[in-house]
Amino acid sequence: MDVSIDFAGLKLKNPILTASGTFGFGLEFQRYGDLESLGGIVVKGLSLKPREGNPMPRIAETPCGMLNAIGIQNPGVEEFINKKLPKLPWKTLPVLANLYATDAEEFGELAGVLAGEEGVAALEVNVSCPNVKEGGIAFGQDPKQITKVAEAVKKNAGNKPIIIKLSPNVTDITVCAKAAEDGGADALSLINTLSGMAVDIERRTPRLANVIGGLSGPAVKPVALRCVYQTVNAVKIPVMGLGGITTAEDAAEFLLVGAKAVQIGTGNFLSPDTAFRIAEELPKVLERVKAESLDEFIGSLKLPK
């Protein structure tokens, strides 16, 4: 079955991408599979300047998932452009950059740096970062700030599609989705991690140095599915689903509720070949459930009467 798809102007050979922060810059996973067998990769979050990230420990295993508080450790956008991007097969593999910033103006500046890079297919904007100018509340929890960030990035991004990555740590994710759409976003990706924590009762200490981290993995999949389903029915722009996908069947569930593409995140930590395996198995799963085509299957959920 042909599983190629157009996502917000991106020509994807299949709807399977990797999630930012779980696949490095792609180069680290080349030994486990053919990068060009994927629909695309989203590289780890990039900031204008290098970031060391949070102190250790940054990761804690939880039942059916994991908590992380990496703190967007990265070498900075210039290092990515000069040393990482040239090594990627970007002519045949869509490479999406994930943007991290502390205010809307900085997001716009970062988009401007990447706008002229032929090897970057699209910009994914992480609005789960704290807005330093507004008291530290995450952009993604304030619809007005989401619109402002989307506008700032869109203004400077040239012809690159803008994907706003939404946080589930809100009362109504559809309000945030509409805010991103109003700001000119070409697409959405969701969900980012759920806010959580873990403690050690023997030491009486948090298991993360940052105390609070982001929960991901199979535990969050029902929440992610609900968020994608609600969002698809609230906006006109396409949605990329992520959250707890570890099998081709999981990926198909997100497509069924209306996502046009999906991202594999924590599954890459469980087994480094996860994304490659899902990309290979998805056509077989769609054929097994008697889908006429990928387009026919997307959003074909039958609701109770």
Swiss-Prot record:
How would you summarize the oligomeric state and partners of this protein? Heterotetramer of 2 PyrK and 2 PyrD type B subunits.
| Protein name (database record) | Dihydroorotate dehydrogenase B (NAD(+)), catalytic subunit
Per the UniProt entry, the Enzyme Commission number(s) are 1.3.1.14
Which residues are noted in the entry as FMN-binding?
S20, K44, G45, N98, N126, K165, I191, G217, G243, G244, G265, T266
Protein species of origin? Maridesulfovibrio salexigens (strain ATCC 14822 / DSM 2638 / NCIMB 8403 / VKM B-1763) (Desulfovibrio salexigens)
Family designation:
Belongs to the dihydroorotate dehydrogenase family. Type 1 subfamily.
**Keyword Cytoplasm recorded:** yes
Q: Output the lineage of the source organism.
A: Bacteria, Pseudomonadati, Thermodesulfobacteriota, Desulfovibrionia, Desulfovibrionales
Gene Ontology BP, a term: 'de novo' pyrimidine nucleobase biosynthetic process
Xref: PROSITE patterns = DHODEHASE_1, DHODEHASE_2
Q: Which reaction does it catalyse?
A: (S)-dihydroorotate + NAD(+) = orotate + NADH + H(+)
- Pathway involvement? Pyrimidine metabolism; UMP biosynthesis via de novo pathway; orotate from (S)-dihydroorotate (NAD(+) route): step 1/1
Where is this chain's protein located in or outside the cell? Cytoplasm
